[in-house]
Amino acid sequence: MFAQLDTKTVYSFMDSLIDLNHYFERAKQFGYHTIGIMDKDNLYGAYHFIKGCQKNGLQPVLGLEIEILYQERQVLLNLIAQNTQGYHQLLKISTAKMSGKLHMDYFCQHLEGIAVIIPSKGWSDTLVVPFDYYMGVDQYTDLSHMDSKRQLIPLRTVRYFAQDDMETLHMLHAIRDNLSLAETPVVESDQELADCQQLTAFYQTHCPQALQNLEDLVSGIYYDFDTNLKLPHFNRDKSAKQELQDLTEAGLKEKGLWKEPYQSRLLHELVIISDMGFDDYFLIVWDLLRFGRSKGYYMGMGRGSAAGSLVAYALNITGIDPVQHDLLFERFLNKERYSMPDIDIDLPDIYRSEFLRYVRNRYGSDHSAQIVTFSTFGQAIRDVFKRFGVPEYELTNLTKKIGFKDSLATVYEKSISFRQVINSRTEFQKAFAIAKRIEGNPRQTSIHAAGIVMSDDALTNHIPLKSGDDMMITQYDAHAVEANGLLKMDFLGLRNLTFVQKMQEKVAKDYGCQIDITAIDLEDPQTLALFAKGDTKGIFQFEQNGAINLLKRIKPQRFEEIVATTSLNRPGASDYTTNFIKRREGQEKIDLIDPVIAPILEPTYGIMLYQEQVMQIAQVYAGFTLGKADLLRRAMSKKNLQEMQKMEEDFIASAKHLGRAEETARGLFKRMEKFAGYGFNRSHAFAYSALAFQLAYFKAHYPAVFYDIMMNYSSSDYITDALESDFQVAQVTINSIPYTDKIEASKIYMGLKNIKGLPRDFAYWIIEQRPFNSVEDFLTRTPEKYQKKVFLEPLIKIGLFDCFEPNRKKILDNLDGLLVFVNELGSLFSDSSFSWVDTKDYSVTEKYSLEQEIVGVGMSKHPLIDIAEKSTQTFTPISQLVKESEAVVLIQIDSIRIIRTKTSGQQMAFLSVNDTKKKLDVTLFPQEYAIYKDQLKEGEFYYLKGRIKERDHRLQMVCQQVQMAISQKYWLLVENHQFDSQISEILGAFPGTTPVVIHYQKNKETIALTKIQVHVTENLKEKLRPFVLKTVFR
């Protein structure tokens, strides 16, 4: 029977449409018993192909297509692994090929268990190679020209499932080669997956011996994977068990903890670790963290269930004492649940590449590798539509309608406007069909963000590799790597560890004190107060609005309640926040069910927040071992009904044996079952809450250091938060501006790095060359390559030359002339001076807006402050608003979102506003929005009057009145009240947004008109002339 060998899969990137799952399905439909894959150079899909075939009752044949240089010509070869030995040879051959190291001598040394096929299209009678091979033939091969001494074998290339896939493959080739469809060569026909019986009949008729050769070749093919654990040995000269014991005992003694119950707990853990064969694993993790600390890196407090291990604490793998804080080792590791211990290594993100180099050098480049991932066609629609000639602006408009997680089919179903665009043109419908066909297919390789694989022997004995920058990269994904018994470790580059380290260094530099951040008091009052206020912008795990609002509700009074907040800030658990608060305040009864489990539930007021509580209850109440309790916890969290039913009966029987009432036991089990579904890992919550507390400690005690580091090392915006904490943005000059942001004496000095598009080299040049004496001096000394308006204008607009010429508009308007002057005249006539042309400067508001546009924040005095200082109207700062009160706020509008109500279809608006210190959400219902909509504009300043409400634990305003707030007013000087009615009538005829103030000279009375605002024009001035002494607009 025919077997399909030469199938290119989607892992031959953009050269096939054969994905493995559909391949298995179609192969069975077409009557195949044996199928193969033969991707070019790589084995990316090999493991999943073999396992998928076995699962689907198909015989897998693993192949590989390569080209190899021999006698100055490239020879095309198709290789077949005939057995497990051949499989391992393919691993090595593919690795050599994907590393650019494959040559004929190496190839010939790895041919045991390999069948070599040379396709007829690549053969010539002059070809002589140093190995035996089959001749591959297809339906179009002219057999009369073949070498009669060679064994023939059917070899038909497949790249797609059906003929109508050809157009899609043509599109993939166009995308791959970055060509238009017209420029892309047409796809070869007759490369679809054909019916097995038809091909069998063809070869039986035309080339029966080739078919027999094929059957003989594949008949005995079978592959066996070695899935046994292959942990590296840490030290071959010493027992890992003894070394681990020595190190952990020394670690506890150094911490002053060589006493009970630590000694017995340590022995208990060491026995389990040794019995499970993980001594080397702990030593390797210890070694890696030791390397980081030896370099001065802050390695954090640990993460995950590993924080429950005393061995990990003794080795300084974690920074949490699990005995003191009642954390469970069995949640991490136990003999009743055999699985690899999972200690993820957190490290400062800026040093991850150094760790990779250390692993490579310490454990060997053949024994360690990064793990591959595959980038897929997520934005397939952009790639495809582009090849159909759709303009970029249309593409952008179309892709905006696609959500991050939406499939094309989903967005087509959900979005009417998207559907209308697709159906508007025939070519759009065609392109959309193609985009759906390739969506989700792998496009290229990438690297796992954290994963590293390590092995005791050469990795290529187990998996294929490819070359990488810092170290080799696996061809198998993480699942296949672990399935082959290899140790996968996650090296997680955490930006927050970088923050802590840089803050420690800056405190030492600026304040002359060394802070051991791991030894700070986790009950520090100032830091707890910061959490209680929800002042946690920039604090790991607590900077999102949900967490901030939760903190404001809970108002943690001790560190344990911060840990609880982490756990409550999750779906399901958050439903118990009100109960938690009321019980803590004594406003709700705490049901502890049974005195024997009261100590377990009391810290969380009777609420099972943590997975460990479920385990401890099973241990104390029903006599389960902690290992068995962990199996119960897992069954509950995974909702394994069959296992839970069995466990429930076991729980009841064990509880009854200990004298518990059956009804109470059943009720307790149901309660445990309910909470286990969303209970959080307490060890992980504790470790990460400790890291959060460390960051918050700096924010509470060294705010200038905190904001300095956050602004320079984070991509997020912390300026607003700093301003809310009473920091101010300082005005800088060309002679004082730093490169990075700097904070001194509560002043924020924005750096040159914030100026979008400014070359780094130019910024460095400015710092190195200053001081400058004038605008002309700066331009004269500026290198010609930087004498471009695109580089110079931002410097002018943010006021860096105000120290020489405060009129920024004047410098900008004269810039062309200045550049001519310094280049042509300045060098010839050093005593000459530039003739400036005068012009009106930008307004305060315009200057501020330009600064915001260029560096993201205003550096001048905020226009609102100027308005507030001159305001004759009473208003309340946003920070002092009280719920259920009427208030007026003076604000700037950041954004306006308009919607239609579901009931009436009328428009209403949601505003996001700020008063330079705080932000506020404002709602205008249809009636108010209809009145004021023409006045509202983003970036403008207003007095808003309304009712203060609380929603989702945040204050917001329901707006009733809107009034423009501008610092300029229209002043009228009049003799007395004689012409009040005439003046009022004239002012009413010129409605606008400028407030009017009248000063009566006779009695020295000044009145700000509250009901009249005007549009100032020359016509208004002329109309008022007979009735006033003077008008001033300022």
UniProtKB/Swiss-Prot annotation:
Catalytic reaction(s) noted: DNA(n) + a 2'-deoxyribonucleoside 5'-triphosphate = DNA(n+1) + diphosphate
EC number: 2.7.7.7
Pfam families: DNA_pol3_alpha (PF07733), DNA_pol3_finger (PF17657), HHH_6 (PF14579), PHP (PF02811), tRNA_anti-codon (PF01336)
Main location class: cytoplasm
Gene3D superfamilies named in the record: 1.10.150.870, Bacterial DNA polymerase III alpha subunit, thumb domain, Metal-dependent hydrolases, Nucleic acid-binding proteins
CDD domains registered for this protein in UniProt: DnaE_OBF, PHP_PolIIIA
Main EC class the enzyme belongs to: transferase
GO biological process per UniProt: DNA replication
GO cellular component assignments: cytoplasm
MF terms in GO: 3'-5' exonuclease activity; DNA-directed DNA polymerase activity; nucleic acid binding
Alphabetic keyword roster: Cytoplasm, DNA replication, DNA-directed DNA polymerase, Nucleotidyltransferase, Transferase
Compartments, record wording: Cytoplasm
Family classification: Belongs to the DNA polymerase type-C family. DnaE subfamily.
Oligomer and partners: DNA polymerase III contains a core (composed of alpha, epsilon and theta chains) that associates with a tau subunit. This core dimerizes to form the PolIII' complex. PolIII' associates with the gamma complex (composed of gamma, delta, delta', psi and chi chains) and with the beta chain to form the complete DNA polymerase III complex.
Role according to the record: DNA polymerase III is a complex, multichain enzyme responsible for most of the replicative synthesis in bacteria. This DNA polymerase also exhibits 3' to 5' exonuclease activity. The alpha chain is the DNA polymerase.
Protein name: DNA polymerase III subunit alpha
The organism of origin for this protein: Streptococcus pyogenes
Lineage: Bacteria, Bacillati, Bacillota, Bacilli, Lactobacillales
